[in-house]
Amino acid sequence: RPPGFSPFRVAPAS
């Protein structure tokens, strides 16, 4: 997992 990984930010915003 990259640094700053968050369970709420698993994908880039569309």
Swiss-Prot record:
Alphabetically ordered keywords of this record: Amphibian defense peptide, G-protein coupled receptor impairing toxin, Secreted, Toxin, Vasoactive, Vasodilator
Record carries keyword Secreted: yes
Domain of life according to the entry: Eukaryota
Example of a GO MF term: toxin activity
Tissue and organ distribution: Expressed by the skin glands.
BP terms from Gene Ontology: defense response; vasodilation
Residue ranges that the Swiss-Prot or TrEMBL entry lists as coiled coil: none
Disulfide bonds: none
Entry's localization field: Secreted
Keyword Glycosyltransferase: no
GO CC field: extracellular region
UniProt record similarity statement: Belongs to the bradykinin-related peptide family.
Role noted for this protein: Induces smooth muscle contraction. May target bradykinin receptors (BDKRB).
Protein name: Bradykinin-like peptide 3
Organism (species): Pelophylax nigromaculatus (Black-spotted frog)
